[in-house]
Amino acid sequence: MAKKPVMLCIMDGFGWTPDETYGNAVVAANKPHLDALMKNYPMTTINASGMAVGLPDGQMGNSEVGHTNMGAGRIVYQQLTLITKSIKDGEMFKNPVLVKNMKAAIDAGKAIHLMGLVGTGGVHSHADHWFGVLEMAKHMGATKVYLHCIMDGRDTDPHSGKGFLADLQAKLDELGIGTIASVSGRYYAMDRDNNWDREEKAYAAFVYGEGNHAANAQEAIEASYADGKTDEFVIPAVTCEGGRVEDGDTVIFMNFRPDRARQMTRIFCDDAFTGFERRGGRKQVHYVCMAEYDATMPNCEVAYPPVELSNVLGEYLSKNGKTQLRIAETEKYAHVTFFFNGGVEAPYEGEDRKVIPSPKDVPTYDLKPQMSAPEVADECKARIESGKYDVIVLNFANCDMVGHTGVFDSAVKAVEAVDAAVNEVVTAVLNAGGCVFLTADHGNAEKMKNPDGTPFTAHTTNPVPFVAIGCGDVKLREGGCLADIAPTMLPYIGLPVPSEMTGKSLIVD
């Protein structure tokens, strides 16, 4: 007998502030299907940032955090919050992995290298963590400390990197240790789509001292701006000739979010890496990941291991014999699988996964704002019609990925592409007798411009919509958060809410 699926449809980066029209691609878009769904079915807004998702107050949400909270059915305190707390209470200075690996370099007269995203974006890393590790290195007596700074410009203003580098240099001057050895854009050093040609350029700067050259970090970033390249696209530049990573050194990757730290970590740590030829083979370094990037990664240690989550939605469905599908294009595949499952890499029994390749024929997604949404929708529709699944978790990447480009007209087209795709899958679910919970993981496309008209490329702290489609004439409450979604879904799946899920249903009895 064909199953009546319960779908969670996630419009990545689709924040909801209909009264703020300036620079709002969500409002500007022609989206008849979404407008009708929001008008004709019960709708509320839910919080997707700050303490509501386990981040510090006022911190914008992001895809990793959003999917983790949705899948867990409880507020999950994030690595950002946990690491910041460990600095404040002094626990970082006793962290056994950091102590051991720093000591190994110091005792051998070798260098400590800090590598990672610089700034206060808080999505992949945070300046406070750099400052904490630098203070720890000083406290332990380190003298050779080199910084390999990856510039942001996606989760922060595209020209904010200059200020972040100045703040970092001021800290180095204050402590009297550390030299910025290289500056690279995240486009090169933090790829997640196996564009090894990009990563190779960043690696060459870190290890061989090859690439552009500048006298210091400020000169490197100013030269990049003068060349029309914002933070994200800074061509890897060497700013200290003696700062190369060498055998016996300690490397600490400062990012706490896994997805964009995995590839560079694999280059340094995996003997079996084949993405490009590493001259002289793998560097024999002591490698520390700030958080766990991949449980299967060899030759590295994790400073802050993941908090174990039990009875997340995927696990709970599997235990109860339910079938489930996770589907997204490449850019968000990890989010509907690894992150939604609370950091578990392998699928649960009864969990099928389908990844649709993200476009490779464009360098940035503003040039193809529909991305692979039509293909995701077509595949999902076929899976719905198969009658095989009790639960489907689907992500459309467009509003987030195109939102990050800062190109307003393209973001509008991205919203319109999502409108068409959502209509296709919602219609299929309703025709199958199922229901859809339509939402987003965080805001982005609803704020594409700064007040002065310059592009705004980061996420926002805005709420996101939550629409209950085909769920009956229910009333939805205000003031909820992403952790409340799984407890809202479970009664429609025919299961009680497990005690581990502390989120509360968004449906008012």
What are these regions (language model features)?
Residues M1-D509:
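Feature captures the catalytic ectodomains and active-site-proximal regions of enzymes
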